[in-house]
């Protein structure tokens, strides 16, 4: 009677929604592993699970007065965390055929993300051979019974969803000791729970996800700022997005790829959202690529209209671009101000009140954005991502990293770069964190000052950029940083060490590719292995394909929700080439993406990058990693920059060429280091060329196409070059008034 009454009351108060197959609970041995987000989780499960389970409760809780009241209605087993043998009692309960509920996190989440997962629950599952049913509880964390005060906007009676995920098992892992087996089992249960979170994520478009964040964190919550130092709330960003969308639709049509040539600024974020909500597909153009690069991108993606700013072109010394790319219809944001009519203003006002009505019909799987590869190995390709692939990557990041509305992101990587777009814009917007957009990662003195001034807690960049920030930063500039993430190139040991010594900060290395939106793997405080790029993100499948001549690792292929829809190539304009890769048997399989990277995966799943397939040289039949050549040079001269390439050789097929900014490096010095490091003499280049600076792409990565061309040239003074990267100005695009 009491059970029925309470169930009715909770159903009315919280509008409980049950999802999933309830018949799967009819198992002989069952372990239920829910996430833990509020003090009501146990009560909700006791009332709404289709079975009557036994709850594992810490003795510190089971001895409380309120548990005596609940004992007649809820079966529970006291669990003393100070006595490891106590979990044997749970195993006996399961073996008797009684279903058991264990909260693997052991405590209520204070971040909104998964907390640490204890290995006890995993050991129980593995030892008993029980079927695991993950359960997700969503919504109740927003109530006063959650522990997210100051993190999320509180609601008295939020809607609650309880989701039953498909059953799984957890065999006892093989390891050298019982302690290691238990630890591995705990890690695998953590992966099961992360997968459960991914499977229950909302299916939204970019604009819908933005509106959901606006509702969740409060429309007047500060969300974004730029070099103008004017901070916009979610409502302010919505207003600008509606203004851009209203005017942009005059120059474009639905489903059109619209070029965006804009700096890191609030108006760029508004332009992306504004185009997206009216079913236009932003194509993020690289303003460091020059006229030829823009024309290649336009041809590949069928771009006819380019949205930009006169102020940006002027300060960036790019005013000749419109003349050089005259085939495009150039739309200047400054010119839009005078075209806003009373009808436009009324339309914007109406949709500020009813923002969901502004969006044209779209599906999460529809194309959302076009990014372009860096072109480090050839012509840039257009990479088409859906709303779902971008938001899946954001959710993968949120699942492993505890970003909250209390965080502040410093975003200096360009938004035309996948790393800058997803991690530097979409993740903070969806997470409720504030983001400061800065137009250039190359201002090595200014960026640290802004990190300090804006109280930033999250910074990301390439190894090169982070190393230069460390050179010019005051030791206190980075005092508030809690996440510093390096990606896009291998993290140098020098950069890692200087951050540790000067700031006491551990850089977390990650790995990503544009085709994966882009994050694939990342080290986080909960799971870190030095010299690796971390664990693959949840919901990502991987396989390694053997490459002839390469003995370490294999060619990494990936499949998951964050994989692109396909390529747009200059050679086949406007035609979407869906991802596909050959498996070990040579069969072409759709949905798999071949990264072209040689990696190793250890028994825990940590990923170590060996190099790219295209960055191996074949010398007299032997495969030599160009990255290993660069690492050899780094050991000899850690302060300089080095890049290895290959050139044609009539006797060996190929020969190594080392480009370095250290004029004192000689082959004898490299040979001595190679002998002490156990590196074969074959990997020591004979052709060593001094350059003032390496040619770089807009992302900060070395321009290997240019380096290969230079390698084929005779070793002369012509190889002394300046960087090819465009020096980006401190500028902020003008905004149309709405």
From Swiss-Prot:
Short name of any one Pfam family annotated for the protein: Acyltransferase
Residues annotated as transmembrane: 258-277, 409-433
Key word Transmembrane present: yes
Catalytic-site annotation from UniProt: 36
MF-aspect GO terms: acyl-[acyl-carrier-protein]-phospholipid O-acyltransferase activity; ATP binding; long-chain fatty acid [acyl-carrier-protein] ligase activity; medium-chain fatty acid-CoA ligase activity
GO cellular component: plasma membrane
Chain segments carrying region AMP-binding: 233-646
InterPro entries: Aas, AMP-bd_C_sf, AMP-binding_CS, AMP-dep_synth/lig_dom, ANL_N_sf, Plipid/glycerol_acylTrfase
Subcellular localization(s) per the UniProt record: Cell inner membrane
GO process terms (BP): fatty acid metabolic process; phospholipid biosynthetic process
Superkingdom as given in the UniProt entry: Bacteria
Catalytic reaction equation(s): a 2-acyl-sn-glycero-3-phosphoethanolamine + a fatty acyl-[ACP] = a 1,2-diacyl-sn-glycero-3-phosphoethanolamine + holo-[ACP]; a long-chain fatty acid + holo-[ACP] + ATP = a long-chain fatty acyl-[ACP] + AMP + diphosphate
Record membrane topology: Multi-pass membrane protein
Main location: membrane
Entries under CDD domains matching the protein: LPLAT_AGPAT-like
Region described as Acyltransferase: 15-138
Keywords attached to this entry: Acyltransferase, ATP-binding, Cell inner membrane, Cell membrane, Ligase, Membrane, Multifunctional enzyme, Nucleotide-binding, Transferase, Transmembrane, Transmembrane helix
Documented EC number(s): 2.3.1.40, 6.2.1.20
Family: In the N-terminal section; belongs to the 2-acyl-GPE acetyltransferase family.
Function noted in UniProt: Plays a role in lysophospholipid acylation. Transfers fatty acids to the 1-position via an enzyme-bound acyl-ACP intermediate in the presence of ATP and magnesium. Its physiological function is to regenerate phosphatidylethanolamine from 2-acyl-glycero-3-phosphoethanolamine (2-acyl-GPE) formed by transacylation reactions or degradation by phospholipase A1.
NCBIfam families named in the record: PRK08043.1
Annotated protein name in UniProt: Bifunctional protein Aas
